A protein has these predicted regions:
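The feature marks the first
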Residues: 1-58, 138-139
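N-terminal beta-strand motif that seeds the catalytic metal site of vicinal oxygen chelate
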Residues: 4-7, 107-115
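Hydrophobic pocket/interface hotspot
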Residues: 6, 18, 51, 61, ...
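Helix N-cap motif at beta-to-alpha junctions
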Residues: 12, 54-60, 116, 159-165
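Short amphipathic alpha-helical segments
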Residues: 14-35, 67-74, 117-142, 165, ...
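Glycine-rich beta-strand-turn "strand-cap" elements at beta-sheet edges
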Residues: 34-50, 54, 72-107, 129, ...
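Short hydrophobic interaction/assembly module
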Residues: 56-66, 77
Length: 210
C-alpha cells in the first residue's frame, strides 16, 4: 500500500473557493478511487492544502489517475489559485494504521522529520519499539517514510480533539518518560535528524477523515 500526499500552496483568501471546487469535482472523481483525507493548514505554513490518496501500488495510481483525467473528472479547475504543487509517495511503517473514513480529529498535527541519508532503518527500529507506549496516551493517525518526492523524510500524524488536549497529552507522555523516542533508553542505535517541522491541519467538510 502507498499513500500519495499532494501539497498545494494557494493564494491568500482563496481557501474557501478552492475547497468548494475540490469538493464538487470529487463527486465525479470518487468513482475511480476514494479520497483518504483532505486538510488545510491552521497553524504553520498558511494557505496550504493537503490531499491524501491511497493506492495499492504505483501502477494502480497511474491507471486511476489516467482514467479520471480522460473522463474529465479530474483535476478541479483551481489553477488560478495555485502557487506551488508537490507530490510525495509515502510508505507506511508497520505501526501505522490504515487510514479509513471516520472521526479522529478535528485537529491533526503533522510532523515531518528529515533524517540523515541511510538512517531510515535505525529510525524505524526506534519508532516501532517506542510508539506502543505512546499509544497509551493518544492514537496515531499515520507513520510514513518517503519513497518518491522529498527523500529521507519521516512523517507522523497525530489527531486530537482540541489543541489543549494535544498539549496535555504530550506533557503526560513526556512526564512518563516514553516520549519523545529515545534510542539510548531502548538500547538501539541512534539515528540522526537534520530538520524538523510541524503543522496543525484541519479537515475540509468533504474529507472522509474528520
Amino acid at each position: 500500500m502507498i499513500y500519495e500526499v499532494r501539497t498545494y500552496d494557494i493564494k491568500p483568501r482563496s481557501l474557501a473557493e478552492v475547497e468548494k471546487r475540490f469538493g464538487e469535482t470529487y463527486e465525479k472523481r470518487r468513482k475511480y478511487s476514494e479520497l483518504t483525507a483532505f486538510w488545510h493548514t491552521e497553524i504553520g505554513p498558511l494557505n496550504q492544502i493537503l490531499h491524501v490518496w491511497k493506492y495499492k501500488d504505483l501502477e494502480e495510481r497511474a491507471r486511476i489517475r489516467a482514467a479520471a483525467v480522460k473522463d474529465g473528472a479530474w483535476p478541479p479547475a483551481t489553477g488560478e489559485f495555485i502557487v506551488n504543487m508537490r507530490s510525495e509517495i509515502m510508505i507506511p511503517f508497520a505501526i501505522s494504521p490504515e487510514l479509513k473514513p471516520g472521526k479522529m480529529g478535528p485537529y491533526y498535527e503533522m510532523r515531518t522529520y528529515t533524517h540523515a541519508a541511510g538512517d531510515l532503518p535505525k529510525l524505524r527500529a526506534v519508532w516501532e519499539k517506542a510508539v506502543p507506549e505512546r499509544l497509551k496516551f493518544s492514537p496515531l493517525c499515520a507513520a510514513w517514510y518517503s519513497e518518491l518526492g522529498g527523500l529521507n523524510k519521516f512523517v507522523h500524524i497525530w489527531p486530537y480533539p482540541t489543541l489543549d488536549a494535544r498539549n496535555a497529552t504530550r506533557d503526560k507522555a513526556h512526564a512518563a518518560g516514553v516520549w519523545p523516542p529515545s534510542a539510548a533508553k531502548l538500547g538501539l542505535p541512534q539515528y540522526n535528524l537534520v530538520a524538523q517541522e510541524n503543522k496543525i491541519l484541519m479537515p475540509s467538510a468533504f474529507s472522509p477523515l474528520q
